[in-house]
Amino acid sequence: MPYLLEMKNITKTFGSVKAIDNVCLRLNAGEIVSLCGENGSGKSTLMKVLCGIYPHGSYEGEIIFAGEEIQASHIRDTERKGIAIIHQELALVKELTVLENIFLGNEITHNGIMDYDLMTLRCQKLLAQVSLSISPDTRVGDLGLGQQQLVEIAKALNKQVRLLILDEPTASLTEQETSILLDIIRDLQQHGIACIYISHKLNEVKAISDTICVIRDGQHIGTRDAAGMSEDDIITMMVGRELTALYPNEPHTTGDEILRIEHLTAWHPVNRHIKRVNDVSFSLKRGEILGIAGLVGAGRTETIQCLFGVWPGQWEGKIYIDGKQVDIRNCQQAIAQGIAMVPEDRKRDGIVPVMAVGKNITLAALNKFTGGISQLDDAAEQKCILESIQQLKVKTSSPDLAIGRLSGGNQQKAILARCLLLNPRILILDEPTRGIDIGAKYEIYKLINQLVQQGIAVIVISSELPEVLGLSDRVLVMHEGKLKANLINHNLTQEQVMEAALRSEHHVEKQSV
């Protein structure tokens, strides 16, 4: 049987740099192939070639789809062939309805007049196909991210898709939304629709794939059956070396209590009747890694936003640092107390995309370079920037490059560099490795371990339970705004954490860390 897709010896250069070099990829109808590689490995470039974003003639090699060579000059050319790509940043218009988004650019008309009755009927069938029980007239901006992702798939199905490319589709989804999405991909597979799945979440890659293709430094490293590969096998192919332990387990000692929070309650910014955090108390020691686990909506981010002074609603409770009660109502007061935070959404809250990498790093510590006068000491600032880039291994062609052009992992390292310039005693990391590749994750994990060895206390909030369990000395489990468990991490399992989240009573382990 001929392949649905064959990409033969694809090479794409930018100036003298080969982004992809002689890469081959092929798949059958109904096959799910995961494309794996670190950020900057060439995955996105290869997909842009396939979709016509990089037009025929701008690359070397040949693309055969459904038995015909594709020579696309625009993404619309490949869409007409049945190839659709859904990016991590969804391409939906939030102010339009579900129906209007699905048919945008593909409206059904009769004599120049749009046939809304026929489009509504078609839209209802498409929504049913992706298991969405919503009205076609629903405004897309009112949907959750998981539902928006499914609307994107319905939009692709409306274009008679034969090959669906999903780029980091679950980066912002809950575990339940992820499960629904994977089930729908499997259902599409039964209808002969092929899928190229791009994700840094290797458990998903293993669960969904028939075949795994690995690219490293722009070159095709290998394609193997998913059933015969372990996560360690994938990592080794991706990074070119064996990571003996993803989570460094260097011994570190904890000191005295540095932080204590008592009876923290936070209300919804608009609806004062809704408690987002409900009577939460906990402590933190010097040199301790405290993980906070829970489902989306558990109140984890709201809790640490109160601690950092950026929760937009009202809250009450007591915060003690070094045994003394402190009042923190903004981030400047938090920083003055030795607290720094890497926010959950780095693109929205963590970086200024058009600003240089170096300026993003020094943004919160400009007082270090003024010497009591208003004029910046440019030489001192540049020296600090270069040292930070080297220390955190930020990969950038220049400190003056706009940070928005860096990979997610390197943006995150730059944000960490900014935090470390503040000389924090308490470092809060909210989803520290979301959407970044395995190599960058490993470097961040090593950095966290180095920081606690220096006595810095670290709070880690993560939706990935293996990450929480792999890093933490102790785990707080939250559910619906309440602290349900405070557990010493003596070989804790994911099942124990989820059981603690869902049980009715509060559970605390009294052992010392």
From Swiss-Prot:
Its chief place of residence is membrane
A Gene Ontology molecular function term for this protein is: ATP binding
Residues the entry annotates as binding ATP: G37, E38, N39, G40, S41, G42, K43, S44
- Places the protein is found: Cell inner membrane
According to its UniProt entry, one GO biological process term is: D-xylose metabolic process
The ABC transporter domain covers 5-242, 259-505
Catalytic reaction equation(s): D-xylose(out) + ATP + H2O = D-xylose(in) + ADP + phosphate + H(+)
Question: Does the record bear Metal-binding in its keywords?
Answer: no
GO CC entries: ATP-binding cassette (ABC) transporter complex, substrate-binding subunit-containing; membrane
* Stretches of the chain forming a coiled coil according to its record: none
Q: What does this protein do?
A: Part of the ABC transporter complex XylFGH involved in xylose import. Responsible for energy coupling to the transport system. The XylFGH system can also transport ribose in absence of xylose.
Which PANTHER family does the UniProt entry name for this protein?
CARBOHYDRATE TRANSPORT ATP-BINDING PROTEIN MG119-RELATED (PTHR43790), XYLOSE IMPORT ATP-BINDING PROTEIN XYLG (PTHR43790:SF1)
Family classification:
Belongs to the ABC transporter superfamily. Xylose importer (TC 3.A.1.2.4) family.
Q: How does it assemble?
A: The complex is composed of two ATP-binding proteins (XylG), two transmembrane proteins (XylH) and a solute-binding protein (XylF).
The protein, known as:
Xylose import ATP-binding protein XylG
Origin species, per record, is: Escherichia coli (strain K12)
